[in-house]
From Swiss-Prot:
GO terms for molecular function: structural constituent of ribosome. It comes from Toxoplasma gondii. Keywords: Apicoplast, Plastid, Ribonucleoprotein, Ribosomal protein. Belongs to the universal ribosomal protein uS2 family. The lineage of its organism: Eukaryota, Sar, Alveolata, Apicomplexa, Conoidasida. Pfam families: Ribosomal_S2. This is Small ribosomal subunit protein uS2c.
Length: 233
């Protein structure tokens, strides 16, 4: 594993490369730096978009605006969960249905049921054995665990946030529909994916397939959110 030191990356020379796109018949220039035999392309574009995302998330946190993280990759589950919990935001995974984004009233009833069952099994369980059959208690418990597993990251959500961070989604349909519903979308995206780019409000240019790249970007975003939250203390 290569340790990336930002000071070293800043101080090494800048190179300008070129490539010919035969399909589109055009000549493309690109900027890159070479560090430990690794090439970093379009470094200024990456920093430009990352700094904009930092500022936006700082302002969100400063004014106590909630953020919802949507994740479609199992390998990023712990990253998303940690980032949401450390910054008092919400998260959910794509392998569960996310229809609630378009039908909040119906989904809110599920959150009410989740809170009710949690209180039931947290505070009143010892009293329930005197009044409810054992089989019914077990059935209710399985319902509770199932809802908690799916929506535990949304348990304390009072209203649906307008700012949504999407991680590892390649569905243009999702981006387009969220955009039509006036959600503000933040996402790590490949700069060459023009269909997705046009539906993202705050773009973070990067490799959204690499766990290490996502983790590096998340550390910066975590700093931005914590930085903004300090304003109110």
């Amino acid at each position: 594993m290569i340790l990336l030191k930002l000071n070293s990356l800043i101080n090494i020379p800048i190179y300008i490369g070129s490539a010919t796109s035969y399909r589109q018949k055009k000549f493309i220039n690109y900027i890159y730096k070479k560090y430990n035999n690794k090439h970093f392309f379009n470094i200024f574009i990456i920093l430009k978009y990352l700094s904009k995302a930092y500022l936006y998330l700082y302002i969100l946190s400063k004014y106590n605006r909630s953020l919802l993280f949507l994740n479609s990759s199992i390998k990023n589950f712990n990253l998303i969960k940690s980032l949401a919990n450390l910054t008092n935001n919400f998260y959910i995974n794509f392998f569960y249905k996310i229809d609630f984004l378009f039908n909040w009233i119906m989904f809110k009833n599920k959150l009410i049921l989740l809170k009710w069952l949690k209180q039931l099994y947290t505070f009143y369980l010892k009293y329930l054995f005197n009044y409810l059959p054992y089989n019914l208690l077990i059935k209710l418990y399985y319902i509770y665990i199932n809802i908690l597993k799916k929506f535990g990251g949304l348990e304390y959500m009072q209203k649906l946030p307008k700012n949504i961070f999407i991680c590892n989604s390649y569905s243009n349909y999702l981006y387009k529909n969220l955009n039509l519903k006036n959600f503000l979308i933040i996402s790590i995206v490949d700069i060459n994916n023009e269909n997705t780019l046009k539906n993202i409000s705050v773009r973070i240019i990067g490799n959204n397939k690499s766990y290490l790249a996502i983790k590096f970007i998340f550390n910066i975003l975590l700093t931005a959110l914590l930085h903004g939250s300090l304003f109110n203390k």
